[in-house]
């Protein structure tokens, strides 16, 4: 196991500490904080060069910042389902979850293809004894600044996420609608 892999193991305890933190802060703020921490880690990865200590610090921050993002993304889908119901539409949790899974797979595939194309265009040659500087720079960019730019897009998008502040009222209204429906249709209560 490499030194950078050990950094990922260090992140595991964060997953156990994280649930109480969710109760104190909004999902939006936690995801945005995670994005900032991840971006700092990615920037450190770019400037680290071959400095293993800096690479480990960058990886630690990158992985720590990813914890709120990965743990809260599914909860955003639930919020969207509640919002849909509140607006009189279908909840569509299954559809929203499927679209999320599909987009993740397509995004991962396109990202891998993009990385391969970019490294090829930069002059990467697996059989070369010495890698050209252009290929090394592209590898560093693909490992740091390009993901950082995408995280900036996530940060901006999360700035527009306004559903959460209305969620207590949305949940209350939805519960009242369900209770009223069950009062009118008691035969559907356990179905």
Locate the predicted segments by residue.
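Membrane-embedded alpha-helical bundles of multi-pass transporters/translocases
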Residues: 1-191
């Amino acid at each position: 196991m490499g030194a950078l892999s050990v950094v990922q193991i260090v992140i595991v305890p964060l997953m156990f500490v994280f649930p109480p933190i969710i109760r104190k802060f909004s999902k939006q703020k936690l995801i945005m904080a995670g994005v900032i921490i991840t971006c700092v880690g990615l920037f450190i990865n770019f400037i680290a060069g071959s400095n293993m200590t800096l690479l480990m610090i960058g990886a630690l921050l990158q992985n720590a910042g990813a914890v709120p993002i990965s743990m809260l993304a599914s909860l955003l889908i639930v919020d969207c389902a509640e919002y849909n119901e509140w607006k009189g539409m279908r909840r569509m949790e299954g559809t929203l979850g499927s679209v999320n899974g599909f987009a993740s797979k397509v995004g991962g595939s396109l990202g891998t293809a993009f990385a391969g194309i970019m490294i090829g265009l930069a002059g990467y040659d697996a059989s070369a004894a010495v890698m050209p500087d252009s290929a090394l720079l592209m590898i560093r960019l693909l490992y740091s600044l390009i993901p950082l730019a995408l995280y900036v897009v996530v940060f901006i998008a999360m700035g527009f996420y306004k559903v959460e502040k209305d969620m207590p009222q949305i949940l209350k209204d939805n519960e009242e609608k369900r209770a009223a429906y069950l009062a009118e249709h008691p035969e559907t209560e356990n179905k």
